[in-house]
Each structure stands twice: as C-alpha cells, then as structure tokens.
Amino acid sequence: MRTWWRVIFDKLLGKKGVSSPLDMESIFKGSGATALQAQAYRGYPASLPLDAGIGAYLVRFLVSEGCMERLTLALSQIGYLVLPELDTQVIERSGDHSGKKVMLFLHPSFAGTIVSFASDDLDVLEALQQTRLAPPLPADSFPWIDPEALGSLQGDVEYWWMNFWLPFWVSLNQEEQLALDLEPEWREFVAIHHPSALSSSAG
C-alpha cells in the first residue's frame, strides 16, 4: 500500500502505472540515506518520515515569490543550481563527487509556489531551514474570500491550511506570529482554527 506522499510524488512525476525516466527509487538507489537528525522534523520546512526504500527524504511546502528567490539562492550557495523556469528537475551537487542530488518539483498555486523535493543531501534541508522561508499571507492566497464568512475548513482552504499554512504557523514563536502582517480577520480565523494561537492574537 502506497503512502500518501508517494501518491503525491507519483502524480508530480506524471506516472500512470508505467515506468518513468524520473523514478525516485532509481535516482536515489544506493544513496545510503537511512536516518535523519531530530531537527529535520522540528525545523521548517520539516521532512516527512524517511523511507528506506527510496533512499531520500521528502519535503513539501509553499513559498511566496520573494521567498522563492531566497530558496534558489540558498541552494546555489551549497552547489545546486535551480532553473526556476523548469517545473521538474534533478540537480546534482556541483563539485561534489559523492553523487548527492535533489529532485525538485515546482508548482504555482495559492499566489506562490508549491515546492516538493526529494534529496539524499542533509545540507539541503539544513540550508532551507536556516533561510526562513514563508508562504504568501492568507489574504494573498485567497483575496476573494471573507474569512469571517468561512465556517468549517473544506476544499482548497482546508488543503492549504493543513498542508502549508499550519505547518508554517506552528514553526513560529509567539513574537514571530504577532509580527506577521495578518489582517485582523485572518488573524482571528487562525486563532479559531488553531486554538493555541488565541494567546498570540490577544496582544
């Protein structure tokens, strides 16, 4: 039985039950990636649980336009040259003979870019976690929505909340949450759907 993240990456690869030139198992075969430090799961963006069958860790998050530029710069500084015009690419680390690589997928959505990647290089995750990446603000992702009129989370809003906004929000401390330029209505929305944010919104 395939896990949900494998289904997502299969869709990104364009698989339809047949082999693909971009096959994660083949690309990362023999990488030796077997464990991640605890920080890989605590930082932002966080890794999904490592799958020994793939030999790489998987990460998925949403970034704003400005943060996308910082992301490509951070990767270039450790030897990975990203071509933003390509939505799917496998990049080997420049000047490194160990065969470390990144398999990167870029998809425009929610007024930003959904970044999905697999890698056997822990330097990549560390670099991204130190870059302070952030998604677009809720009002930018959903300019047509009145948050005060929203009831339960559903559809695109639920998908955005569970997969992108909430993981980012909980990675912030209270001071960082208060510093975000959230409109009052969206701040209240966050507080309602994530109760621990109530103290942050009370400021």
Language-model-detected regions and their locations in the chain:
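Polar/charged low-complexity regulatory segments
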Residues: 2-203
